[in-house]
């Protein structure tokens, strides 16, 4: 499996590309600000054909170029209905103050939009993506999971073994969690989503967040200060996350 990407725009939002390998169909996750040209270069480098865009949530730093990119290639954009209104009106999800940064730019909904449904996987480009609704950072936040071939310390595939990879947007970061002070955010709900949707995953699950470096569930379970004592029924004292819109 090929999983690659780059940080896009002033918010350094991680845009990911997922495919079964070079020369195959591909899925783009979270094309943010100024992502179109880097995406095209990455797709050309690996001889990939984009077939869909997946959005972890509707905040502008993750969706900025979803419409122009998807419409140029004639491919659908998948998003949870809770965040779909942000595609045409980003200020709905970030508030008036942050919305002022949009200026005179006009946003429209992509020509093809498909609503994601909790616990209903989608198969795209020959890859099955688990779909878990994880509200709290936004009303429609989604965690996508895929099973990728496991590799050893030298990078060689381990026959018959896989590792879960979670694309979790702004739900959980290395050492932090998503902010909850924007419209539709809820700290209590975010912690509940993490407890219900991420912490049950194996410790070796690779987390590819919307901002910052990759991490693992085991590392965050052991060291993330926001998760200490967090289970399916317990929450730590309220704290604020630090990344992303």
Describe each model-derived feature in a short phrase:
Residues 1-46, 144-146, 152-167:
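Conserved beta-strand hairpin/beta-sheet module of binuclear metal-dependent hydrolase folds
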Residues 2, 49-50, 203:
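Short loop/turn motifs at secondary-structure junctions
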Residues 6-8, 111-113, 133-137:
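Short Gly/Pro-enriched turn/cap motifs at secondary-structure boundaries
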Residues 26-29, 52-55, 133:
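Short catalytic-loop micro-motif centered on adjacent basic/acidic residues
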Residues 27, 54, 77, 165-167, ...:
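Residue-level marker for buried hydrophobic side chains located in beta-strands
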Residues 34, 92-98, 121, 128-133, ...:
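Metallo-beta-lactamase
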Residues 34-127, 149-153, 222-230:
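Active-site HxH/HxHxD metal-binding segment of metal-dependent hydrolases
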């Amino acid at each position: 499996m090929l999983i690659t990407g780059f940080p896009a725009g002033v918010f350094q939002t991680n845009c990911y590309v997922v495919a079964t390998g070079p020369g195959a169909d591909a899925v783009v996750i979270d094309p943010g600000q100024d992502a179109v040209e880097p995406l095209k270069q990455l797709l050309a480098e690996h001889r990939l054909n984009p077939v869909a865009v997946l959005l972890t949530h509707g905040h502008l730093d993750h969706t900025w170029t979803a419409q122009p990119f998807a419409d140029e290639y004639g491919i659908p954009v998948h998003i949870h209905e809770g965040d779909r209104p942000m595609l045409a009106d980003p200020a709905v999800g970030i508030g008036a103050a942050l919305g002022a940064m949009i200026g005179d730019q006009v946003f429209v909904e992509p020509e093809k939009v498909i609503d994601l449904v909790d616990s209903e996987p989608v198969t795209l480009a020959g890859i099955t993506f688990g779909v878990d609704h994880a509200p709290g950072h936004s009303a429609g936040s989604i965690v996508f999971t895929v099973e990728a071939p496991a590799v050893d310390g030298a990078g060689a595939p381990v026959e018959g073994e896989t590792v879960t990879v979670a694309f979790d947007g702004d739900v959980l970061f290395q050492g932090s969690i998503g902010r909850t002070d924007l419209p539709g955010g809820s700290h209590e709900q975010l912690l509940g989503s993490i407890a219900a949707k991420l912490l049950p995953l194996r410790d070796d699950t690779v987390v590819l967040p919307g901002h910052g470096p990759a991490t693992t569930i085991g590392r965050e379970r052991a060291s993330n200060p926001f998760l200490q004592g967090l289970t399916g029924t317990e929450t730590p004292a309220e704290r604020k996350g630090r990344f992303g819109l």
